[in-house]
């Protein structure tokens, strides 16, 4: 055949012949199906077939004349309509039409059907190229059946080369309109409308973090994801440990999935139908299916990376056939947003003032922007939009892109992180908040708002134009240090971004943040559920509805938070401190009031190690242990280390370690390291007795200062006396460093002082501390200060030259591995 190529005959080098989409389908069918990646069969109508159609209808010069100049959105829309009307009025030449009919009959026979249902997709010759993202610009027709319907759909695909979005994008990218041609793919249609479909990215779409596979899934046909009509289920899988054979599903987030797009065969049209509440309340993919999709995604990424000779993150579409119950890959293309960004330099954003929160939703990106809100109900009113405004609408599709390019930020009432609005916002580098259900009614037209996506997974819309600061960070420009520079991290949703800062790992991962924001239930409210008051049981039931075993809710949810944070810094060490709430803070968790007795001074009361072995909390601590065990053993994240807080005596340390052993965590087994916070004078005075029990010490400067100076750090009246730089505190730190090193143990610090006082960080370096763990916003400036101090010491004492930022001993110490920020 002259104008037909079967997928099995084409590959990634055939983009000029069959376009990026079809070339990729052929590549996968030929090269990856033998490796177990299933791709539905089909054929491509070549770009030369499209040009044959244009010539046969004398359209080439007419189209070029219409598109010779385009000025503004309205002009592009008018000329787009004129060109598409010309194409749709054209006739497919008989020789081309017969080849298409014959190929369709052959495909139907191959699939055992008289007249096969097919998906018909446009595939531009400039599509899916690095730096060019035509995805969504051209037409796709689903559930097409019969020769006449196939021919009609092919003509509609031809016309879609001239949609307003496609014309505008070619203008922006500098592609001549006659230099880009179109191929059409005809592929076996899966019964996805009765099952599941979705998208896969082999990186985190918000940050570009490349060690994860992100999977979004919905019921029915996949157009609802792209159009942002529903909130999908979301899954993250860790690539490195998946390759090692583990099952590292880092997190699962249940989407709204309120609509299912189906094909109504009686009416020959696609309809959105409401999904029953019981289906919405469960994930649409099983864990085994998530892991299978992630493995296929790795195989696809590996293949394309080898083919291109460079790492190539991928944007993949999958579908589940409702008839066979099997998963298939239906598209794959190189990811273009993060691939187009070069170098390691990145910008950080932070609000410097606060305002009233008007609205919340899913944050897309890490930026902050302000502007007047423009609330637009539908695309017919796009002309009302003015450059620099904040677009507020239900959802967007490719028709909105001329407006999106002028927006300072985007807010949509529907959609998830892989919706059209989210994808384009990332591409344009503007903040977007999606899935903000009340956006259309909460934000008044013309009101000045600030859109912040710099505060974790939740995006906030504030009233007014709030002040914020930015900082450009180039890790390559920062000096190397002997002292390992780590970070204090609590929010797992910020971990992927924070891991891009120059660092040697996490010196303090705060479990209590995950307790409060992810788990939200007191552990004993789950182990002793039957003793709860009736109204509290209702609250607990709402949070644990998907879990038959309420204990499993706690373990699973806590493990997801820990795993996400730990995976972000893999393989650098992450030191997780077991829960260190005070009794009044535990009481604020759902169900907590039933298990916490009010204390006069919770700061010095029942906290830290003393809770872990006590009969009144031991069951809760064992759930913490079970979550950690799952992260290390099921997910394979063995870079996770542990830390015991507020351990008053060596005997308490032994008891806490014994309970950990009871729960299956044994120091030394599987490389497990356990550290202890040095925040009580007894930890310093008895350093020689604590050292045999633990792998290292972490100075908690906040509590240590409080207890050395006898100052309640929560008291306003004595607050001026609280100073980590006091000579007594400095002497305690120096004594601990000397004693720990003498015992063959390492010392770090994870308290607030080095972040607030650069001179205190310099003092610690002078004392020989092994690592300093800082708040993320202090990493860059403190790293520079530490390098200056080390250079001064080197000049004075002839210390060896810096060794860089890779994990390793800070200086010649005994056999124990150097602790990261502990």
Which residues are covered by each model-predicted region?
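Conserved catalytic alpha/beta cores of large enzymes that bind or transform nucleotide phosphates
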Residues: 212-313, 319-323, 354-370, 378-381, ...
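Conserved short loop/turn motifs at secondary-structure junctions
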Residues: 12-14, 45-51, 84-88, 174-175, ...
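Conserved alpha/beta-domain cores
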Residues: 115-119, 124-134, 139-141, 179-183, ...
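Conserved metal-phosphate-binding beta-hairpin within the catalytic cores
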Residues: 136, 309-336
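N-terminal beta-alpha lobe that positions the nucleotide/phosphoryl donor
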Residues: 1-185, 194, 280-288, 292-296, ...
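Extended active-site and interfacial segments that coordinate phosphate-rich ligands
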Residues: 134-168, 192-265, 330-362, 406-413, ...
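Acidic, glycine-rich flexible loop/linker segments
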Residues: 323, 337-339, 367-390, 394-509, ...
């Amino acid at each position: 055949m002259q104008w037909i190529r079967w997928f099995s005959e084409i590959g990634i080098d055939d983009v000029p012949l069959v376009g990026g989409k079809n070339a990729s389908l052929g590549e996968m069918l030929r090269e990856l199906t033998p490796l177990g990646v299933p791709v539905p069969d089909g054929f491509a109508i070549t770009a030369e077939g499209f040009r044959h159609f244009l010539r046969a209808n004398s359209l080439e010069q007419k189209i070029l004349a219409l598109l010779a100049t385009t000025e503004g959105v309205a002009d592009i829309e008018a000329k787009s309509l004129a060109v598409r009307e010309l194409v749709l009025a054209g006739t497919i030449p008989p020789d081309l039409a017969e080849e298409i009919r014959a190929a369709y009959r052959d495909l139907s026979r191959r699939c055992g059907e008289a007249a096969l249902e097919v998906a018909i997709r446009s595939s531009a010759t400039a599509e899916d190229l690095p730096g060019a993202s035509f995805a969504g610009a051209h037409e796709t027709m689903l559930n097409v059946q019969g020769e006449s319907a196939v021919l009609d759909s092919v003509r509609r695909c031809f016309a879609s080369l001239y949609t307003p979005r496609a014309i505008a994008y070619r203008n922006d990218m500098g592609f001549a309109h006659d230099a880009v041609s179109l191929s059409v793919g005809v592929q076996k249609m899966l019964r996805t409308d009765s099952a599941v479909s979705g998208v896969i990215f082999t990186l985190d779409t918000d940050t570009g973090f490349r060690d994860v596979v992100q999977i979004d899934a919905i019921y029915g046909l996949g157009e609802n994801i792209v159009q942002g009509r529903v909130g999908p289920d979301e899954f993250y899988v860790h690539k490195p440990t998946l390759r090692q054979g583990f099952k590292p599903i880092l997190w699962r987030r249940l989407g709204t999935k309120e609509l299912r797009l189906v094909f109504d065969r009686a009416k020959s049209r696609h309809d959105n139908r409401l999904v029953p509440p019981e289906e919405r309340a469960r994930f649409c993919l099983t864990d085994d299916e998530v892991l299978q999709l992630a493995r296929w995604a790795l195989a696809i990424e590996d293949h394309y990376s080898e083919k291109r000779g460079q790492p190539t993150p991928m944007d993949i579409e999958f579908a589940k056939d409702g008839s066979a119950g099997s998963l298939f890959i239906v598209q794959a293309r190189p990811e273009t947003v993060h691939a187009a960004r070069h170098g390691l330099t990145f910008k950080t954003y932070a609000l410097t003032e606060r305002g009233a929160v008007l609205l919340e939703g899913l944050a897309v990106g890490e930026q902050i922007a302000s502007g007047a809100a423009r609330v637009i109900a539908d695309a017919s009113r796009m002309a009302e939009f003015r450059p620099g405004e904040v677009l507020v609408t239900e959802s967007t599709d490719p028709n909105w892109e001329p407006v999106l390019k002028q927006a300072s930020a985007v807010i949509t009432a529907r959609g998830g992180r892989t919706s059209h609005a989210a994808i384009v916002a990332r591409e344009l580098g503007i903040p977007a908040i999606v899935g903000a259900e009340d956006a259309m009614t909460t934000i008044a037209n013309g009101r000045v708002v600030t859109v912040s996506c710099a505060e974790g997974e939740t995006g906030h819309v504030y009233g007014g134009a709030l002040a914020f600061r930015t900082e450009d960070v180039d890790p390559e420009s920062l000096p190397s240090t002997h002292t390992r520079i780590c970070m204090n991290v609590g929010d797992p949703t910020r971990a992927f971004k924070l891991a891009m800062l120059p660092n040697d790992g996490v010196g303090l991962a705060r479990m209590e943040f995950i307790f409060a924001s992810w788990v939200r239930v007191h552990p004993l409210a789950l182990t002793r559920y039957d003793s709860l008051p009736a109204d509290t049981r209702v609250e607990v039931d709402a949070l644990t509805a998907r879990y038959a075993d309420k204990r499993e809710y706690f373990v699973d949810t806590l493990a997801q938070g820990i795993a996400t944070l730990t995976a972000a810094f893999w393989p650098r060490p992450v030191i997780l401190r077991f829960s260190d709430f005070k009794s009044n803070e535990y009481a604020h968790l759902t169900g907590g009031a039933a298990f916490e007795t009010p204390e006069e001074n919770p700061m010095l009361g029942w906290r830290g190690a003393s809770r872990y072995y006590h009969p009144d909390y031991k069951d809760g601590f064992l759930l913490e242990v079970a979550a950690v065990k799952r992260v290390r053993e099921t997910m394979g994240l063995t870079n996770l280390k542990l830390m015991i807080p507020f351990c008053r005596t060596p005997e308490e340390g032994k008891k806490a370690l014994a309970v950990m052993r009871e729960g299956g965590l044994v120091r030394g087994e599987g490389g497990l390291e356990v550290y202890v916070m040095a925040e009580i004078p007894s930890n310093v005075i008895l350093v020689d007795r604590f050292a045999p029990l633990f792998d290292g010490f972490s100075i908690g400067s906040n509590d240590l200062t409080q207890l050395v100076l006898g100052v309640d750090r929560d008291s306003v009246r004595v607050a001026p006396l609280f100073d980590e730089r006091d000579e007594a505190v400095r002497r305690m730190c120096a004594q601990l460093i000397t004693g720990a090193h003498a015992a063959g143990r390492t010392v770090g610090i994870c308290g607030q002082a080095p972040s607030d006082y650069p001179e205190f960080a310099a003092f610690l370096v002078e004392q020989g501390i092994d690592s300093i763990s800082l708040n993320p916003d202090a990493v860059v400036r403190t790293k520079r200060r530490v390098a200056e101090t080390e250079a001064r010491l080197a000049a004075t004492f002839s210390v060896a030259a810096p060794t860089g930022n890779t994990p390793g001993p800070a200086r010649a110490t005994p056999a124990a591995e150097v602790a990261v920020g502990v």
